[in-house]
Amino acid sequence: ARDAYIQRQVALKISRGISSQSRKKLFLEAQSAGRLSNPNILAIYDTGLYKEFCYIIMEYVEGQTLKKWCRPQHLLPIDQCIEIVFKVCSALSYAHQRGVIHRDIKPSNIMLDKQGTPKLTDFGIARISEQKSEKGVWGTPSYMSPEQLKEETGTHQSDIFSLGCVMYELLTGQRAFTGENDFTIIYKITRENPTPVRELRPDLPKIFEDIMRKALAKSLEERYASCMDLAYDLRVALRGIMLPKGDKKVEDIIDLLRQVPFFHNFTREQIESLGLASSIIKVPEGKIIVTEGDIDDTFYILLNGKVKIRKNDTVIAKIRAGECFGEMAYIAGKARVASATAHTNCLLMKISAILMDKAPDAVQLLFFKNFARTLSYRLEKSSGLETGSNSK
């Protein structure tokens, strides 16, 4: 469908003559997802009743669900699987911090758009923390946590278990827990461990055995305590896969960063610790790096090249090597207030806010001090420009 007023494509979910329970589910989806604004969560624009119809108007995503990529003949590269799960982790962490538990994480509820960006969908049985918990089994048996199957109150760790099941299937093309019927599946989830992931995919690094064991632990005490913890281990795994293929060795990257003004007051060990919260990316001239209005949890440090910052199509700043940008979205947790475009070919350090929170306190303190210095410099330049224009 097309929104004629805003001139954008939208998706419509329409139900006719549904029961009060189904109507409640539909509006719960709108209420749960509607309070969330995240690049990896499908946006809800509007919901309502019209005669005997219930409807939700939502973001249109051109792509397919992860179900296609969970089949043995369509498995994605390992690094792409990790990136997908990492981004879903980030989305879930965002939702959990706002009191929303999804409760039905599965491949068919995660869209993958044409650019490979995952979008978490269908909050129809989500639970909002301030609401009274309903008794009963909620979810899809093959992806439900042991505590959900026992009709206990699901928590954010229940979502982690379900995401672990999705990750297992993405990597192997096989469900973690299978059976002839739901009773067999429920028994296996509550009593048995799945086949070790490396028996099905021997090319996986050993760290994946530890990640899957913690994600699919039956005990809450042994399971990952938060999505942030899982995301951190996924970043460790990704670096282990990607670094041998990179243009530079770890030592070369550290030496490069030590020459960047932003890191002049960092020790070598502190720069090394940033490796797990960041990635080095190349951006060609003319490519948009961040877009005004986007919600994102990453910020950037320009290592080489030039970047232009635009607001309403007007250039408001030029970023040079050694300077950071995008930090206000991280600090304030709000939408991007400007766009950034590569003015030349650029080498960037892209830093994840969710993983920066796991960095040592001393490293975080240095970052905030350098952010403050950057903001002070920009304000000083801005004031100088205003003074200059007023004196003319």
What are these regions (language model features)?
Residues 84-85:
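Activation segment signature within eukaryotic-like protein kinase domains
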Residues 51-65:
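Conserved short submotifs of the Hanks-type protein kinase catalytic core
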Residues 90-100:
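Protein kinase catalytic-loop region centered on the HRD/HxD motif
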Residues 16-35:
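AlphaC helix of the eukaryotic protein kinase fold
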Residues 66-76:
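AlphaC helix of the protein kinase catalytic domain
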Residues 47:
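Activation-segment/catalytic-loop signature of the eukaryotic protein kinase fold
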